[in-house]
């Protein structure tokens, strides 16, 4: 199977997000890479499902709370930026202060 670097990146994000989802489901608090992957994968999937950039920017702030992540993580994550593929092309989605 031949994958482009972008496709490899998306698979890596998905794999990390799947791990984060499982850990979150077991009641574990997510660390920095897990939190970023969890939010990023949700944005990528939302774009694939046809949501708009504005919808995804709003949705990204509802995915994780302070209780879902380790201490200090919300202060470390100011923005999450994801280059997502929409029906009309690739766009950059920025979620400001995603962990509230």
Curated annotation (Swiss-Prot):
GO terms for molecular function: nickel cation binding; urease activity. It is an enzyme of class 3 (hydrolase). It is found in: Cytoplasm. Pathway: Nitrogen metabolism; urea degradation; CO(2) and NH(3) from urea (urease route): step 1/1. The keyword Calcium does not apply. One of its GO terms (biological process) is urea catabolic process. This is Urease subunit gamma.
């Amino acid at each position: 199977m031949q994958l482009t670097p972008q496709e490899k990146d998306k698979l890596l994000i998905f794999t990390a997000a799947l791990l984060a989802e499982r850990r979150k489901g077991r009641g574990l608090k997510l660390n920095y890479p897990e939190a970023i992957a969890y939010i990023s994968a949700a944005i990528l999937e939302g774009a694939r499902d046809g949501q708009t950039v504005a919808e995804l920017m709003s949705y990204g702030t509802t995915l994780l709370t302070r209780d879902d992540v380790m201490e200090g993580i919300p202060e470390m994550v100011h923005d999450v930026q994801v280059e997502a593929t929409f029906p009309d092309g690739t766009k950059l989605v920025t979620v400001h202060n995603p962990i509230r």
